[in-house]
């Protein structure tokens, strides 16, 4: 929002913020304290020479004081934002020092907030989350004069930070608020819609996720070889898979793989193969699952996603009842992820699925795994889908053993989870 302060009020606030006395300013401009008081109250005139001395004395030579300077500053601010948005950090960093003089003006809350929020995006893109979080924590003190653009950037940044912390519901709330604050300068883009779609997926709401991911594809020209296009396609296909739309998911997964290979992005290609393996396992096409899994293992050999590909290999071996090799793969996986608290439950789960006839394993799956994965904020999100799969597995197991009472108990839990996924909403805490 535009500051309505007079010139005198502005220099008074600057003086007070810098801890300068009226007498000191009077000496600098070769006048009296009374004149300075009148100047600050708008009762005295100043010329260009005096203005230049005041600027130099306060260290605000390059700070925008007047309307034309402020408009020029805003224009450069949005150029800076565009550089950051386009990942052109070299030019963004070059502009940053030229825009920082706004921080010398204690009354320019909105422009300072805008500067901080664009700077926060730079911190995040550089991986400096501590600095970004510190900036966000100071932002609320500037909200009294915040413009729609500033609020958009604040909520976008806060949503991203909380997404990285896996605080999904609050993250979603901020991203949705960022959409509510779109303007001509800051509009929603495919990245925001991807994040919203991803969080809905993590929270076990695949169809809400599909709505935003499809919107990202139709509303924006992403470019057929862009990383963002590949990310959106992979997320979209994953949602279709968990929604039971296997044919749609398979087409998109294969397209994602082709796109990734076209730009020699083995990690993206491998990620597509990991999820395609899951799809083939769900369809019962074990041969295709093995082929996709082997491709994923080759592509992801030096990446953290390799653990997921290895887990899929164990699932494939369970389906072919090759329990001896499956045991070796599980042992390898446990050793690989022993220091990663987010991945260790994956191989613990598989080890119990591989020994389903053991009462200790069924007890683990019922009383530990299902409650654990039903929590939407575990295992990188999306755990609720895993909980539903475990219910289906246990129900089939108990029916095979003719333990109908247990089968019915598990079926009830499975139906409740199904209702959560396909008919429940997201409840935000105040």
Task: Show the residue positions of the predicted features.
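TPR-repeat structural position
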Residues: 89, 129, 168, 206-207, ...
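Amphipathic alpha-helical segments of tetratricopeptide repeats
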Residues: 96-104, 136-144, 176-183, 214-225, ...
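Short alpha-helical DNA-recognition segment
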Residues: 19-37
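Alpha-solenoid helical repeat architecture
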Residues: 70, 107-113, 146-153, 185-195, ...
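DNA major-groove recognition helix of helix-turn-helix/homeodomain DNA-binding modules
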Residues: 49-64
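A short, Lys/Arg-rich alpha-helix, primarily the initiator
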Residues: 1-17
């Amino acid at each position: 929002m535009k500051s309505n302060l007079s010139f005198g009020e502005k220099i008074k606030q600057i003086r007070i913020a810098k801890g300068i006395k009226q007498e000191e300013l009077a000496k600098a401009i070769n006048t009296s304290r009374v004149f300075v008081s009148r100047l600050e109250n708008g009762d005295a005139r100043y010329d260009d020479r005096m203005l230049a001395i005041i600027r130099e004395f306060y260290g605000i030579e390059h700070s925008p004081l007047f309307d034309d300077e402020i408009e020029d500053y805003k224009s450069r601010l949005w150029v800076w934002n565009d550089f950051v948005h386009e990942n052109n950090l070299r030019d963004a960093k070059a502009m940053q020092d030229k825009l920082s003089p706004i921080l010398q003006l204690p009354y320019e809350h909105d422009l300072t907030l805008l500067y901080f929020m664009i700077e926060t995006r730079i911190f995040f893109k550089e991986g400096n989350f501590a600095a970004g979080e510190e900036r966000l924590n100071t932002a609320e003190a500037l909200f009294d004069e915040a413009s729609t653009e500033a609020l958009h950037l604040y909520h976008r940044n806060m949503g991203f930070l909380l997404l990285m912390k896996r605080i999904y519901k609050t993250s979603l709330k901020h991203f949705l608020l960022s959409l509510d604050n779109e303007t001509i300068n800051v509009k929603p883009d495919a990245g925001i819609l991807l994040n919203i779609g991803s969080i809905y997926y993590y929270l076990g709401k695949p169809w809400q996720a599909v709505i935003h991911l499809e919107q990202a594809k139709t509303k924006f020209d992403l470019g057929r070889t862009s990383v963002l296009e590949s990310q959106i396609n992979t997320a979209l296909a994953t949602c279709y898979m968990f929604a039971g739309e296997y044919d749609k998911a398979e087409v998109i997964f294969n397209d994602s793989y082709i796109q990734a290979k076209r730009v020699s992005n083995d990690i993206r290609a491998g990620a597509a193969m990991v999820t395609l393996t899951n799809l083939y396992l769900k369809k019962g096409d074990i041969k295709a699952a093995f082929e996709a899994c082997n491709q994923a293992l080759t592509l992801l050999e030096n990446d953290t996603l390799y653990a997921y590909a290895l887990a899929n290999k164990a699932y494939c071996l369970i389906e072919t009842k090759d329990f001896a090799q499956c045991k070796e793969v599980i042992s390898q996986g446990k050793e690989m992820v022993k220091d990663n608290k987010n991945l260790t439950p994956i191989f613990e789960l598989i080890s119990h699925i591989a020994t389903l006839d053991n009462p200790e394993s069924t007890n683990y799956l019922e009383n530990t795994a299902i409650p654990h994965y039903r929590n939407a904020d575990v295992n990188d999100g999306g755990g609720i889908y895993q909980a539903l799969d475990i219910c289906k597995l246990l129900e089939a197991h108990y029916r095979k053993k003719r333990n109908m009472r247990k089968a019915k108990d598990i079926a009830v839990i499975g139906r409740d989870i199904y209702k959560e996924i396909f008919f429940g909403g997201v409840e935000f805490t105040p």
